[in-house]
Every structure is written in structure tokens, then in C-alpha cells.
Amino acid sequence: MAEITSLFNNSSGSEEKRIASSVSIDQGLNGSNPNDQYKNMFDIYWNEYAPDIGFCTFPEEDGWMLIHPTTQSMLFRKILAGDFGYTDGQGIYSAVRSTETVIRQVQATVLMNALDATRYEDLAADWEHHIQQCNLHAGALAERYGLCGESEAVRLAHQVFETWRQTLQSSLLEFLRGITGCLYTSGLNGRVGFAKYVDWIACVGIVPVVRKVRSEQNGTPAPLNTYMGQAAELSQMLKVADATLARGAAVVTSLVECMQNVAIMDYDRTRLYYNYNRRLIMAKDDVTGMKGECLVVWPPVVCGEGVVFDSPLQRLSGEVLACYALREHARVCQVLNTAPLRVLIGRRNEDDRSHSTRAVDRIMGENDTTRAGSAASRLVKLIVNLKNMRHVGDITETVRSYLEETGNHILEGSGSVDTSQPGFGKANQSFNGGAMSGTTNVQSAFKTSVVNSINGMLEGYVNNLFKTIEGLKDVNSDLTERLQFKEGELKRLREERVKIKPSKGSHITMAEETRIADLNHEVIDLTGIIGDDAYIANSFQSRYIPPYGDDIKRLSELWKQELVRCFKLHRVNNNQGQEISVSYSNASISLLVAPYFSFILRATRLGFLVTQSEVHRSEEELCQAIFKKARTESYLSQIRILYEMQVRAEVIKRGPRRTPSPSWGLPDPTEDDERIPEPNKINNQYMHVGYKNLSHFMKGHPPERLRVHKVNAADSTLLDKIRANRRRGDGRWDVRNKYTQHFRLQRNDRQLTNTSRRGVGCERRDRRS
């Protein structure tokens, strides 16, 4: 109110006065709004951030700045959606967005308003109609069940009334629940959804809404009209149903109208402008161009770099991004900074070397001189030379050099060979050749034979290789076609991935994927490590990921602490300290639910807010609890008490009933029915409670003197005679102990009986013990 007064005092134009006046009217400061109890929560900022201010110059006027959408504000919404990861603590936000409390508040509002419309006259008339139809009025109950005693008759009357009360309650609540159900289709989760309201508060602390002019064409919702037609039968049976159902329908119609006349603007298509000089916030829809008003729960703060919002996401966003960056760094380290191939090298002991290696060493000799001259070393040298060949023509030279080196050892006895024998050719039979000519021919023939044998073997091997190569070409052609198809499909998927941004998962771009794919393999040189006594035991891939589990755990705890303390939530734990559930507390209901109905919907028939215990109750339990708090319960209690008193009076009026004698020997005053005439009823009229109740009272706490209330004697001459004969000067009997009382009451009973009989003309001698 002080802010509005300052507007009047400081403004020079009529526009500011009109603005302040409209704000005061909208906020119910003139006393017409029943929700003034919540005004103080938002009076400063709600009055300053008023609707319909400056739209004529907005946003061309100097001083306006865009505060949403920005990179920061859109980042808040992504964090809520889990785009930067999701932790256990963030799950508490689902409890904040739950509409359970709003639904319970709507049910309580409709039920309480409807039940408070009950009139006492209607309830009394319905009760009288019921007992007359069932013949259960007080006189009938006393006549039929009075013989069972006064207490039993009253207990029966109580049960009769409770039966009718339960039936009435079930009938009313059933139809009221049906009326409330018609409200759920009106948009509690739609354009004016409570979840959207909470999202705006959690992100920026501001809720922009668009209102439309109230029209008379809204009328009553169609489902409600249908249901009210079905409730006509109940109205014919119960008079109280007319006012109750009419009030309930009126409340539902009012709430539906409030929901239809307002819409909470969407987060992704709304622009928020802030005027620092005038301290105003405006909202505008990007698509429709509609301008709306703003409910500012927590005002923003202007700093050098822009605007800082006073919201939970503003405080949590830095930690969320830091933890996300750490996880991304771990993934980059996994992909880029870690050598994927590791080699495990083992050392051999002398005893672990294979048998073939020891055999080769033994054959080749123990020292280098022996190895150089041994046939085994020459054979190994031949194998190495064959392995290092680059052309097929090198085979002849390699074999000839080996044969020249070893020919003297292989053909040492070739001089005694007679080459003139058949099989060595005619050229060798000449006389001039001699012994040396024969030896040379043998060596040449041996070399030629060995070379031809190796060439034949290699020719067959090469032919097999050509066949294998032809087969591999066919297989390679097929694999090439399949690879090209897969590459084309992969390229198409990458292009689609670039066009459609994923809401979750990896944030690696196309260029980054290309760079990762083009990475060269890391070459590890093991020449200096692996020797003759070493071997490669195993090779494996290893992924190094920097640990970030502690950071995620800390972030989860931050989510829990911020949401619970900011929204005043109530955490329910078991005996072991483990969290079972998170729910709204009474402070949460006042912080979120009350402004939602008061300032967003502007509901004028809200009534009392639901409590924390009522939110967790079932629908049936909530209805019963509200029924007990409504004025209907008070009316029914009064009708019940009056009905029980009527039954009690009727039982007393019809005289005493035969009851068992007291445990300590008091005689029953009604033992002889002829002693007391029917019209007089001496015992009940004179002593009011009877001997049974009197004896019970005296047995527990026997008084020294017992006052017996006097009866007005103007109605009967007989009672005057009784009083004159038995009354003492002070109108009291002395009661010394229970035995004296017993005998005196016995004597008084006899004398009272005889006196009454004399009064009616029955003369009889007093029987004395």
C-alpha cells in the first residue's frame, strides 16, 4: 500500500494515478477481495510490476531490455529437462510440479462452499420427514423400547440418527464429487496448468499470464449441466440438496470461468522485457503478439553483464555446467588422450625356453666359429636369403651360392664317379675330359637338378597363389560394395543427426566426429624392450576415464537442498533415516498454491487452504474431514441432541420400568406396582433419579447428607399430604452410613406408599418389621 501511495505522490500525470488505481482494485485493496491475507507476500513487486502499464510505448521507449529468452534463461529450461544430465536429487522437482495439492484444494473448496450452504430448517425438515415415514419419532421409540430402560432407548435413538446421518452424508458427497469431477476437464493441466506455473518460478521467478475480458457467453460447462440434470432426483428427495448442489455448481462454474479467462504463457515463445528505470516487466507472445502481465515472485537483479534471476536454477546452473564439463572432459580423455593399445611383455627364464630353440642352438654349435662353419648355419642362411628375395629370378642365384658354399662337402667323393657310364650323357664319354671333367659335370648336374626342383615346387606354389588371389579379388569386390553401402548409410544418418538436435546424449558435432575418425594410430616401438629372452604375453585395450562420481553426488545433494529449502518441502524419512517421499508442507502450500489461486486464477471463493495432512488423504477421507468441519455437522449434532432428549423425556413421561435390585440390597421401589398409582409416579417425580441411580451414587461416594429435591405441590393435594407427613423442617434426610440409609429409605418407601394409598381411599395397616 505504501508503494501505491508513493506512486500518487511522485507522479505528475494522470496515467500513473490510473495505473496505481487499477493495481489497487486488481489486488483487492478496497476490501472486496477475500484473499487479502496473501497480499503481503507479493505486495511490493506485484504492485510495481503491474499489468497494462506502458504498452503504448513498449518496447520503443528507452530503458527496456530483453531478459528472456536469452542463452542463460533457455539454459535453465534445458537443465530442468535433463539435457545436461540427471541426478537423484533432481527427482525432487517432480514432487514440486505435482498437481495433487491443487486438486485437493479444488475439492476442498467445492465441498466446503457447498456444505456451508446448508440451512438448518432444511436439515430439520428432512429429519422430521424421515422419522415420520419410518415411524421413528420420540414417542414411538419410547412406547416400543422404553421397557428396556432409559439408557437403552437413548442409545437406540442415537443409532437411528447416525444411520440417517451416514446416508445423508454419502448422498451429498457422492453428488458433490461428481460436480468436482466436471472441473478436471477445464484445464488444470492445460493452458493454465500448475506445472507450467512452477516451471516459470523455478527458472526465472516470474510467471507471465494473458487474460481475456470476461464474457457472459461462458455459461455453465456442458458436463456440469448434464450432471445437474441427473441430480434432480436427489433434490426431490432432500430439501437440503437444493441449496447444497446449487452452491456447489456455482463454485465450479466460477472456477471454470477463472481458468478459461487466463492462460500461462509458454516458455519457448514468450519474450520478457524489463525496464530498470520504471521497474516494470512486460510479456509478449512471439507468435500472436499478445501482451500479458507478470506475477513476480522473486524480482531479477541488473548487473554489469545483464540480469541475474533470483531463482533456484540460477543458483544451480553453475554447478550443473561444471559437472557436465567434467563428464565431457572424461569422455574426451577416453576418446582422444588415451592410447587404446597396451602391450604386456614377459621375460623368459632359461628353463622356460622351448625345445626347438635348444635343439637349434645345439646343432649350430656353442660358439660363433663353430656356427659359421657348420652345415646348420649355412642352411639357416639359405632360408633367410630365400625369405629376403624380391624377385623370382633370385632363386637360382641364392641356391647356386648355397651349393657353391656347401658343394665341396656334399660332393667330396664325386671324383671316383665314372661319368662315362650310361646316364651321364654322351658328352661326358670323351676321353679328353679326365677325372676333373667328370667331377665338374657331377657338381653342375647336381646344381641344375636342385634349381629345377625348387623352381618346379615354386611354380606349383605360385599357381596356387594365383588361384587364391582370384578368389580374394571376388571376395574383395563384394566387401567393397557392402562397405560403400554402409558408408552411404552412415553419411545419411550423420546428416540427419545434424539436422535434428538430440535432447539427450552426446554433444559431439559432425566436425568433431570427422576429426576423431581421422586420428592416426599411435605407433609403439618395442625394439629396445623385446629381446631374445622376452615375449609378448598379451595386448588389450584400456580406457582411462577421470573419476567424477563425487562431483555427481555433490550435485545431487545440492539439488535436494535447494529445492527442499527454496520451496519449503517436507521430507518423510523412515526410522533408518532413509527418505521415503517428499511432499508439500503448510509453508509450501502458502508459497505456491495460494498465489496460484489468488493471483493467477483470481478465484474469489477459495476458502481456507488445505493442510499438509489433508493433501495426503484419499478423496473419501478428505470428504469426511471436510464434512466434519462444515456447518452441516454442527446442525446435525444439534438435531441429534434434541432427538435424544425427546426420547429420554418420553421414556420418563411413560413411567419407571422394572430394573434389577442394587448389589448392596436396596429394595426396588417399583416392586409392587399397586403401591404407586399411575398418575402420581412418586419415585420418579419426587426423587427424579430412582433408587437404582441413587444407590449407585451413594455406593461410590456416600455423602453425609443427601438433598432430595422438592416437587411443586400445587398440582396435587396428595403430594401435600405426603410432604406434611414425611418432610422435616430443613427438607433433608440425615444419611449416616449405607445401612442407616438402607433402613430409612425402606421405611420411607413404606410410609410413602401407605400415605399414597390412603390418599386414594385404600385403607391398609402399615406393615412394620
Swiss-Prot record:
Q: Entry's InterPro entries?
A: Herpes_Portal (IPR002660)
Look up keyword Disulfide bond and say if it applies: yes
Map out region (Putative leucine zipper motif) in residue numbers.
458-479
Task: Write out the GO cellular component annotations.
Answer: host cell nucleus; virion component
Query: Biased-composition ranges for Basic and acidic residues?
Result: 760-769
HAMAP family documented for this protein: HSV_PORTL
UniProt lists the family membership as follows: Belongs to the herpesviridae portal protein family.
Question: Would you tell me the protein name for this molecule?
Answer: Portal protein
Q: Which organism is it from?
A: Varicella-zoster virus (strain Dumas) (HHV-3)
Gene name tied to this protein: 54
